[in-house]
């Protein structure tokens, strides 16, 4: 009441239903020595969400804040843990996430109000030990043709690309639910003081943010020490403030396609319905070769005449203008992308 509801500038706009519940027996072992059960997770999610909505109906509820892919699959963390509630129904679903969404949808019907606004999961790359792996890591989020070289792939490959599978479940079991990654890092988090100062981390973050846009992610929160990662900061700024004056990637995604995602990723946008300017983010993943990217804008009635190229390179994490073209013709631009 003091701060106001979620619609005010001082109110709390969102609430998370705790954090990484299947790890409670490890992270909060004195309070919760046993692994959380399916029944406990669902009932506590409903109870807490209903309490918040009773106080502030405009607030968004985020949950269940799973630590990664495995809880989405089986609702638990330990290989030897068996939940009889989940085992009794799991044959009806592809993975545990489907069941959780079903339960929250049924809770809305019972309580007369939505009790889960945003499905929230954390994501940390499992194949990130080398530069080569980090350059491809974001593809596990959105590229159906990619298979990462991690311990997850042989056992759980059917759940990749991860964001695509999450959104498919939402669309089927609880349409209208938003998707968030309130913790994510696709770099080598344990070695970020070194990797964060390498241009590879910029390419990884750039493609990750593009994948979020491509897959309709509502909210994402980078987990790491950004003061140690100037290249990651610049990658974020490519989308939010690339000219230092507030210029940003557009809010409407334009269909784009790379001929080979192993070599280059591409994402394009416009601002609203304004097609006068197209903003494109490109990456060159080669460590040795300059890539000449030909950007062709098909299907537009506009005739584009100029282009400005901003870049992050290995020489500096600063975003700099590396090319200005005032002779664009046939809606086609060629851009030289330096190697790493």
In which residue ranges do the predicted regions lie?
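Extracellular/periplasmic catalytic domains that process cell-envelope and extracellular macromolecules
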Residues: 7-10, 16, 54-56, 110-115, ...
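Carbohydrate-binding surface patches
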Residues: 260-303, 340
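Noncatalytic carbohydrate-binding groove/subsite architecture in carbohydrate-active enzymes
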Residues: 2-3, 13, 38-200
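Extended hydrophobic-aromatic, low-complexity segments
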Residues: 178, 190-191, 248, 278-281, ...
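Flexible loop/turn segments at secondary-structure boundaries
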Residues: 21-25, 68-72, 125-130, 186-193, ...
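Acidic, Ser/Thr/Pro-rich beta/coil linker or hinge segments at domain junctions
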Residues: 301-339
């Amino acid at each position: 009441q003091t701060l106001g509801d979620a619609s005010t500038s001082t109110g709390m706009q969102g609430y998370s239903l705790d954090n990484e519940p299947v790890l409670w027996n490890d992270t909060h072992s004195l309070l919760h020595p046993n692994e959380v059960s399916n029944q406990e997770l669902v009932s506590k999610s409903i109870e807490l969400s209903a309490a918040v909505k009773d106080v502030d109906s405009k607030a968004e509820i985020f949950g269940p804040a799973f630590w990664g892919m495995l809880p989405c699959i089986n609702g638990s963390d330990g290989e030897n843990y068996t939940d009889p509630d989940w085992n009794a129904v799991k044959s009806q679903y592809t993975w545990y996430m489907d069941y959780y969404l079903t339960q929250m949808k049924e809770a809305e019907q019972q309580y007369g109000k939505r009790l889960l606004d945003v499905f929230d999961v954390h994501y940390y790359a499992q194949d990130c030990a080398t530069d080569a792996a980090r350059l491809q890591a974001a593809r596990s989020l959105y590229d159906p043709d990619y298979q990462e070289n991690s311990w997850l792939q042989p056992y759980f490959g059917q759940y990749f690309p991860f964001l695509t599978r999450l959104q498919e479940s939402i669309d089927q079991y609880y349409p209208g639910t938003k998707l968030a990654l309130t913790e994510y890092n696709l770099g080598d988090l344990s070695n970020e003081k070194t990797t964060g100062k390498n241009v590879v981390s910029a390419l990884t973050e750039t493609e990750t943010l593009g994948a979020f846009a491509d897959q309709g992610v509502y909210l994402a929160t980078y987990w790491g020490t950004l003061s140690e990662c100037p290249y990651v900061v610049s990658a974020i700024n490519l989308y939010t403030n690339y000219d230092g004056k507030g210029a940003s990637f557009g809010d409407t995604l334009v269909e784009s396609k790379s001929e080979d995602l192993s070599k280059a990723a591409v994402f394009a946008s416009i601002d609203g319905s304004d097609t006068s300017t197209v903003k494109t983010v490109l990456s060159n993943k080669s460590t040795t070769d300059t890539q000449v990217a030909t950007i062709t804008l098909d299907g537009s009635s506009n005739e584009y005449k100029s282009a400005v190229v901003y870049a992050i390179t290995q020489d500096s994490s600063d975003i700099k203008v590396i090319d200005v073209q005032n002779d664009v013709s046939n809606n086609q631009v060629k851009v030289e992308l330096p190697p790493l």
